[in-house]
Swiss-Prot record:
The active site is at 142. The keyword Cytoplasm applies. It comes from the Eukaryota. It catalyses: N(6)-acetyl-L-lysyl-[histone] + H2O = L-lysyl-[histone] + acetate; N(6)-acetyl-L-lysyl-[protein] + H2O = L-lysyl-[protein] + acetate; N(6)-(2E)-butenoyl-L-lysyl-[protein] + H2O = (2E)-2-butenoate + L-lysyl-[protein]; N(6)-(2-hydroxyisobutanoyl)-L-lysyl-[protein] + H2O = 2-hydroxy-2-methylpropanoate + L-lysyl-[protein]. Disulfide bonds: none annotated. It comes from Gallus gallus (Chicken). Histone deacetylase that catalyzes the deacetylation of lysine residues on the N-terminal part of the core histones (H2A, H2B, H3 and H4). Histone deacetylation gives a tag for epigenetic repression and plays an important role in transcriptional regulation, cell cycle progression and developmental events. Histone deacetylases act via the formation of large multiprotein complexes. Also deacetylates non-histone proteins. Residues 9-322 are annotated as: Histone deacetylase. Its EC number is 3.5.1.98, 3.5.1.-. This is Histone deacetylase 2.
Length: 488
C-alpha cells in the first residue's frame, strides 16, 4: 500500500510524453502545448525527476473516451484532419470545432495523450500505488459530452473522476483556473457523488457560467460550489477565501479522493487572465489541499503566458514533492525565454484589487450558508467494482520499438517554432529577450549541462515492455521510472 500516513512526504507519480509539445493549435492561437515541454525541461533541470516516478502515459482509446463522450463526437475527432475539413463542415459546426477549437495535425492523438495521463493517474490512485499523480497535459475542463469548447476537445477530468468513482464513494473536484470548470460541473451537476468547487472571474465572461447561485440540481443540489472573483485578486485575498471554503467543504462532504485542476491563467500577467496571483499564491492552493492527506490527482489547464505556466507547474511539482527549489532558474533548453530576471518566482503587478474585504466576506458567508444545507457525507450503495481502465500487464498498443524512439532532449532541440513564444509580443522591448547579462553564466551552465548529459538522458521517459508477471520490469534511471500503459 502506497498511501503515506500523516503529514510525511508523499509518493508522487508524474505523467509525460515527449510528443506532447509537438502539437500546434495554429499561428496566433493562445493555447500552446509546448508549455508542457517547457515545464518538463525545467523540472528535469531542477533535478525533481529523482524524487518521483515518471511514466509515459498510454494513448487513451476511443472506447475509454466514450465512457463519457458520445460515440458520434469521438468518431468525428478520430476522422477530422486539416486536409479533409471540407468533408466535415456540418459536423464541425455541430461539434463546435473550427475557431477556438481548431483542427490541427494530430488532434486526436493529442487528446489521447492528455486523457491517457489523467486516467492512468486515477488508476494508480485507485490501486493505492501512489499518493499523488500529476499530469500537466490534462485539466481540459471545458469539453462537453458532444462538443468542443474553450480549446478543449476531450474532458480528461470527467473521465478520470469516473475512474476514481469505481473505488471512491465521493470525489471532490477543485478548479483554480480563472475560467469556470463548466464541462466538469455539467457532467456531475445532478449527482452527490462528485462535488465541484470552482473560482470564477466575474469579468472574464467565458464560458459565462459559474454564478454563485449555480449550486447543482436534483440529488446534486448544493454539490456545485462557485465563488466569483473580481479583477485583480491577489495572494492575500485569495488565501482568505480559498482555505476556509475548502476546509468547510472537507468537513461537510468528507471526500475520499481529490482532483485539483491547476489552471495557470489565474497568474498575474496572463495573456487571457485578469487576476494578480503570484506563483507562490497559486501554489498555496496545492499546499492547502495536500494537508488533508487524501489521494490527489493534479492536472494542468489554462495558462497562456507560457514561461509563467512553466514556472508555476514546476514549482507546484516541487510542492507536491515537499522539495525546496532555488529561485535562481537552472540553465535549461528554454533559458532565454525566462529573462530578464531568470527567476522562478514572479512579482504581482500594480493592478487594483477590486475584491474588497466586504465583498469577500459576503461571498464567503453565502457559500457557508449553502454548505450548511449539505447532509453530512452522503452514503452510496456499494456495488461490484468495475474493471480498471488501464491494465498493467497489457501489451504495447502501437508495437513500436521503444529503443528507436527519439529522445525528449533531441525532440526538444528539434522543435523550435517561433510562434510558440509569442506570449509576450505585447510587452515591448527588453522583456524576456534581455539575456546579455547572463551570457557568461549561461556558457558555464552549458558546459555543466554537457557533462551531465548522459545522466539527463537517463531521465528521458521511455516505453518499455512489461514482464509477464504484474510487477513489471522497471529501469533504474536515478528515480525516473517508465511504464508502458496501453489499451485494456
Amino acid at each position: 500500500m502506497a498511501y503515506s500516513q500523516g503529514g510525511g512526504k508523499k509518493k508522487v507519480c508524474y505523467y509525460y510524453d515527449g510528443d506532447i509539445g509537438n502539437y500546434y493549435y495554429g499561428q496566433g492561437h493562445p493555447m500552446k502545448p509546448h508549455r508542457i515541454r517547457m515545464t518538463h525541461n525545467l523540472l528535469l533541470n531542477y533535478g525533481l525527476y529523482r524524487k518521483m516516478e515518471i511514466y509515459r502515459p498510454h494513448k487513451a482509446t476511443a472506447e475509454e473516451m466514450t465512457k463519457y463522450h458520445s460515440d458520434e463526437y469521438i468518431k468525428f475527432l478520430r476522422s477530422i484532419r486539416p486536409d479533409n475539413m471540407s468533408e466535415y463542415s456540418k459536423q464541425m459546426q455541430r461539434f463546435n470545432v473550427g475557431e477556438d477549437c481548431p483542427v490541427f495535425d494530430g488532434l486526436f492523438e493529442f487528446c489521447q495523450l492528455s486523457t491517457g495521463g489523467s486516467v492512468a493517474g486515477a488508476v494508480k490512485l485507485n490501486r493505492q500505488q501512489t499518493d499523488m499523480a500529476v499530469n500537466w497535459a490534462g485539466g481540459l475542463h471545458h469539453a462537453k459530452k458532444s462538443e468542443a469548447s474553450g480549446f478543449c476537445y476531450v474532458n480528461d477530468i470527467v473521465l478520470a473522476i469516473l475512474e476514481l468513482l469505481k473505488y471512491h464513494q465521493r470525489v471532490l473536484y477543485i478548479d483554480i483556473d480563472i475560467h469556470h470548470g463548466d464541462g466538469v460541473e455539467e457532467a456531475f451537476y445532478t449527482t452527490d457523488r462528485v462535488m465541484t468547487v470552482s473560482e470564477v472571474s466575474m469579468v472574464n465572461n467565458f464560458p459565462g457560467t459559474g454564478d454563485l447561485r449555480d449550486i447543482g440540481a436534483g440529488k446534486g443540489k448544493y454539490y456545485a460550489v462557485n465563488f466569483p472573483m473580481r479583477d485583480g485578486i491577489d495572494d492575500e485575498s485569495y488565501g482568505q477565501i480559498f482555505k476556509p471554503i475548502i476546509s468547510k467543504v472537507m468537513e461537510m462532504y468528507q471526500p475520499s479522493a481529490v482532483v485539483l485542476q491547476c489552471g495557470a491563467d489565474s497568474l498575474s500577467g496572463d495573456r487571457l487572465g485578469c487576476f494578480n496571483l503570484t506563483v507562490k499564491g497559486h501554489a498555496k492552493c496545492v499546499e492547502v489541499v495536500k494537508t488533508f492527506n487524501l489521494p490527489l490527482l493534479m492536472l494542468g489547464g489554462g495558462g497562456y503566458t507560457i514561461r509563467n505556466v512553466a514556472r508555476c507547474w514546476t514549482y507546484e511539482t516541487a510542492v507536491a514533492l515537499d522539495c525546496e527549489i532555488p529561485n535562481e532558474l537552472p540553465y535549461n533548453d528554454y533559458f532565454e525565454y525566462f529573462g530578464p530576471d531568470f527567476k522562478l518566482h514572479i512579482s504581482p503587478s500594480n493592478m487594483t484589487n477590486q475584491n474588497t474585504p466586504e465583498y469577500m466576506e459576503k461571498i464567503k458567508q453565502r457559500l457557508f450558508e449553502n454548505l450548511r444545507m449539505l447532509p453530512h457525507a452522503p452514503g452510496v450503495q456499494m456495488q461490484a467494482i468495475p474493471e480498471d481502465a488501464v491494465h498493467e500487464d497489457s501489451g504495447d498498443e502501437d508495437g513500436e520499438d521503444p529503443d528507436k524512439r527519439i529522445s525528449i532532449r533531441a525532440s526538444d532541440k528539434r522543435i523550435a517554432c517561433d510562434e510558440e513564444f509569442s506570449d509576450s509580443e505585447d510587452e515591448g522591448e527588453g522583456g524576456r529577450r534581455n539575456v546579455a547579462d547572463h551570457k557568461k553564466g549561461a556558457k558555464k551552465a552549458r558546459i555543466e549541462e554537457d557533462k551531465k548529459e548522459t545522466e539527463d538522458k537517463k531521465a528521458d521517459v521511455k516505453e518499455e515492455d512489461k514482464s509477464k508477471d504484474n510487477s513489471g520490469e522497471k529501469t533504474d534511471t536515478k528515480g525516473a521510472k517508465s511504464e508502458q500503459l496501453s489499451n485494456p
